[in-house]
Structures are given as structure tokens and as C-alpha cells.
Amino acid sequence: MNFKFGLISVILMLMTALPVVAQVALKTNLLYDATLTPNLGLEVGLAPKWSLDISGNINAWTLSDGRRWKHWLAQPEARYWFCDCFSGHFLGFHALGGQYNYGGWKHGVNFLNNRFKDLANERHQGWYAGAGVAYGYTWILAKHWSVEAELGIGWAYTRYDVYPCAHCGTKLAEKRVHNYVGPTKAAINLIYVF
């Protein structure tokens, strides 16, 4: 009872604060859309040169031939705008976290010390968390519409279990650790500003 009352109180306080906020925007990352990964972002202007972007995506599809590319990601980002919020150049400072279940991919690519070729005969299931910095630019198209491009680099820590195939349940290894350094964000966002 007290938890529900507290939660409702916080939601009502946040709702009353929204009209004070200069701008709110909804966005979708067209790069995720191209991979059939549903995604949504919300950005709120906090001050004349600062905003908070919270984006997330989920891919729950099992593909043909037993391949898996299931994952979810949450990525909050504080942004500093060089001119005004929602226009022009910005720097972003983001965190990221999520879970994944990948396997059955028959390509022999190694990229930034990641052994994607292992996914041909294995399935990796685990979680990750990290942080990074990004640079982006927003072009205003019309009163309510914008397009944004952003690239980020950073670090992610992941812990995962290894299975012998995309659908097998027997573990080959558990709690493996990997520290990734490289691109952590790539976006071409279509934005609607309220």
C-alpha cells in the first residue's frame, strides 16, 4: 500500500513538472529499425544547454536456421548542447546496460577483440554494463521534426555463459568475463519535438 502510494505520488509530481520543461522529444533510431529491433527514445530539456536522453531497444526474434540475436538495451545519456537544446552540435555522456542471447551466426569476423566467429558453433548468453562519450549533430527539418546523427565510444563489461549450440541447454562454460572498448553508440534518429 505505501509503495503504491509513493509510486503514484512520484508519478504525479513528475507529470506536474513536465509543463515547466522547455521541450520534450520522442525518437526512433533508424539503424535499429533497419535490423528489425524495436526502439524508442525520450529526450527532455533540463536547462538551456543540457538535456537528458533515455533510449532503449529490444530484439526478441529467433531467426531462421537456429540463429539467435536476442537482446535488450537501455542507454541513458546526459547531453551538453553547444548552442540550444535540440539543435546543432552536442556532446553526450552515456551509460548502457542490458542482456543478450546470441548464437548460430556463421561468419568468421573478429572485430575489436570480439570473437564473433565463436558464435558459429556456440551461443553466448549474459549481461553487460558500461559507459561512454558521444558526439552528435541535430538538423531541424520542420517545426516539430528533426534528424540526428550520433557516434559514441566507450567501455562495456560483460559476463556470460557459453552453450554448445543455439538451442542447447548444457553449459560449456559459465561466468566468462570480457571487457570491450570501442563503439558503444551509433544512431540516425528521426525525432518528433512536442
PLM regions: where:
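Sec/Tat signal peptide C-region and signal peptidase I cleavage site
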Residues: L18-A22
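Repeated loop/turn-to-beta-strand initiation elements of outer-membrane beta-barrel proteins
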Residues: V24, K49-L52, F86, H144-V147
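Solvent-exposed loop/turn segments connecting transmembrane beta-strands
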Residues: L26-G41, N59-K70, C85
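Membrane-embedded beta-strand positions of outer-membrane beta-barrel proteins
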Residues: L26-T28, L42, I54-G56, P76-A78, ...
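Transmembrane beta-strands of outer-membrane beta-barrel pores
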Residues: L30-A34, G56-T62, Y80, A95-N101, ...
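Outer-membrane beta-barrel proteins
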Residues: L46-P48, R79-D84, G136-L141, V193-F194
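Extracellular/periplasm-exposed beta-strand and loop segments of Gram-negative cell-envelope proteins
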Residues: G56-H71, Y100-F111, R115-Y128, Y157-C168, ...
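Outer-membrane beta-barrel "beta-signal"
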Residues: W81, Y180-F194
